[in-house]
Amino acid sequence: MNSSVRLLRLSAVLLIMAASTLYSINVRGATGSFAFTNYELGSTPGTTCPNALANCYNFAAEPAIRADNSGNFYASSENGLTGGTVAWKSTDAGLHYITLQSPNSASAGSMQFSPAGGDTDLAVASLLNGNGFYNVYVASLALTNVYVSTSSDGGGTWLLNPTGASVPGDDRPWIAADGASKVCVSYHSITATNDIFVTCSTDAGTTFAQTGNAFDPNHLWLASFQNKIGNLAIDSNNHNIYQSLSGIGSATETTCLNCSLHAVWLAVSTDGGLTFTDHAVFVNPDTSVFYGHQFVNVSVDQAGNIYVVFSDDHNLYYSFSTDHGTTWSPPSQINQSPSSTAIMPWSVAGGAGKLDVVWYGTSYYHAGTTPDNYPSSAAWYVFFAQNLQATTPGSQFSQTIATPIIHYGGVCESGVTCSGNRDLYDDFGVAASPTSGLASIIYSDDQYSNTATQPAGPGCTSSRSNTSYCDSTNIATQTSGTGIFP
């Protein structure tokens, strides 16, 4: 959910435009030989970026990205509630992206009005539809419900369903697709004590007739505001649905005043989303550790191995499961120097045992200081790490910095309750092309650059660098190094 600060900034733009030590942690790794090209995306439909016209700028944040099985990348980002959602497509391995029509408005304007435009997520079908395309689905938060927009022609047109959630009063929707026409949306229901529901459609988003509760009868205590939702994933081979989250560790902790969300969970459905069984990925014995930062993340590789990535506000860990989420490996640390702090992770899995992970990282570290209170000297980058043997205990991640500096100073991770700097908002993403194996990262940046590939938009000046006036959604596409497919 976006804060009033985000809405105020959008209004201004419209006017201008008219870890615990009780378990073993693997920290071995190596510097990766990867290369990335970076550029800003456009906001006007039909604009291809990068270009030499100085019109590749936008004011969007909290982006998402996916790749279809043909190697096309699709991405979305938000302009804030009532501002609408922006979408892009790349057909050349992420070297260029074209701005599509907004998924939740028929308007051709770059800043059209829409009740949606809050939290956004994106999914692509795993099988072709009758038109020879992979359906593309974009979820957009409108608070009263979740908008789900479907494109059956490769992003050319969209069909909008404004009732993608069956339970009203929603927050933080996630979306995942399976087969040619199944799509599921998960979300927090604020009116139902922050319960997590998964609503599914079997007709490409036209109707959402099936709703399941992510909490099984033995874990209903995870509701009652004792959890924080993570993303949703579907294994296209066995059709299992996986909902990630953080929460308390046991029913007895519902009355514990000093217990944080020190456990990571995965809700598993083997019946298409009708029912779920909740499995503990990791429960830290230190109840003061907090994993409820944006966001616990789950991904599934082609062999059905599952990876869950999570941050304790300073370091980044992953656990894997080779038995469909029933049992889990001990957590292993991913980040290494110079990323002394690692937050807001996202992952994508490819071939068996192959995993890419991205996060916002800085060389600054202070164990007693949250990133929200980091000094102005703390420089943040997008970090990229890859493990080609991620189901092997003790295996190494190769790590590199994928972007220029994207932010200085504090980074708030408390969503709408933020009192500090929220320019990076809550999440970003990475996808990998099944045809090349290489990654394309979509991320937020609040720096004034004004270069050919990152021109300054209206209102973004050198004096406003590192503020929300310069917020934009950018791309970092991998151009060399190993990939994760096949």
Go through each PLM region and give its residues.
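Sec-dependent, cleavable N-terminal signal peptides
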Residues: 1-30
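C-terminal PAP-associated
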Residues: 27-486
